[in-house]
Regions:
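Cytosolic-side transmembrane helix boundary signature
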Residues: 1-2
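Hydrophobic membrane-insertion alpha-helices, especially the h-region
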Residues: 5-20
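Enrichment for repetitive, rod-forming helical segments
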Residues: 12-13, 64, 181
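A structural signal for short, hydrophobic/glycine-enriched beta-strand patches
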Residues: 19-173
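A transmembrane-helix-recognition feature enriched in membrane-embedded lipid enzymes
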Residues: 168-187
Length: 187
C-alpha cells in the first residue's frame, strides 16, 4: 500500500511539473527574430469560418510580421470534415489584414502537428528560410518545438497569442498525453 501511495504521489508530481512547464514554455516569448512564422492550424467553425482560437493565432503572426520579427508567414493545416480548406481560409484572412501574398506560404497537406512540421520545413527549405517562430496556443508549443527538433530543425522559437478559453481545461491534459505519445513514437 505504501508503494502505491508513493507511486501516486510521484505520478501526480510528474504531471504537475510537466503541466507547469507547458505553461511556462508556451507563454515564454523570447522576442527572437526569424525568417518565418509558422501558424499551426486548429479547429475551424462548422460553417467554415475561422474559430476565435485560429484567428488569435493568425493575429499573433500578424503582430510578429508588423514588428518585423518575421519576414514571411506559413499557414499550415488541412482541417477536418467540412473544414478541409483551412490553409486557404488562413491565407485569405492574412490577405484581408494587408499581409502581401508574396509573404505568405500555405501548407494544405498537414492534418496533424507532425505533418504540419514536415510540410512547413519543406516549404522553408524550398524558399531558403532558416529560422522559424512557431505560432500556436501555449499548451501546444512544447510538443510542436519537440517535433521540429526531432525533424532535425533546431532554429525554432515560439510565440503564443494570449487567448484562453474554457476548452483549455481539456486541451492541457490532452497535450500532456500527446507529448509523450509523440516523444515515444518519434524516438
Amino acid at each position: 500500500m505504501k508503494m502505491i501511495k508513493k507511486l501516486i504521489i510521484a505520478m501526480s508530481l510528474w504531471i504537475f511539473c510537466h503541466t507547469l512547464y507547458l505553461f511556462i514554455d508556451g507563454l515564454n516569448d523570447e522576442g527572437k527574430k526569424a525568417d518565418v512564422a509558422i501558424v499551426l492550424g486548429t479547429k475551424m467553425n462548422n460553417d467554415g469560418t475561422l474559430s476565435a482560437r485560429l484567428q488569435a493565432r493568425l493575429d499573433q503572426s500578424i503582430v510578429l510580421y508588423r514588428q518585423q520579427r518575421v519576414k514571411k508567414i506559413i499557414v499550415s493545416g488541412i482541417g477536418h470534415g467540412p473544414n478541409l480548406q483551412q490553409a486557404k481560409r488562413m491565407h485569405e484572412y492574412l490577405l484581408s489584414q494587408d499581409i502581401p501574398a508574396t509573404d505568405i506560404y500555405a501548407d494544405d497537406k498537414g492534418y496533424d502537428t507532425e505533418r504540419n512540421v514536415k510540410y512547413s520545413l519543406a516549404i522553408m527549405k524550398e524558399n531558403n528560410l532558416h529560422s522559424a517562430i512557431s505560432v500556436s496556443q501555449y499548451f501546444h508549443q512544447t510538443r510542436a518545438k519537440m517535433l521540429f527538433r526531432k525533424a532535425g530543425f533546431d532554429n525554432i522559437s515560439s510565440s503564443s497569442p494570449r487567448y484562453f478559453e474554457w476548452q483549455d481545461i481539456i486541451a492541457v491534459p490532452r497535450e500532456f498525453v500527446a507529448f509523450y505519445v509523440e516523444w515515444l513514437w518519434t524516438w
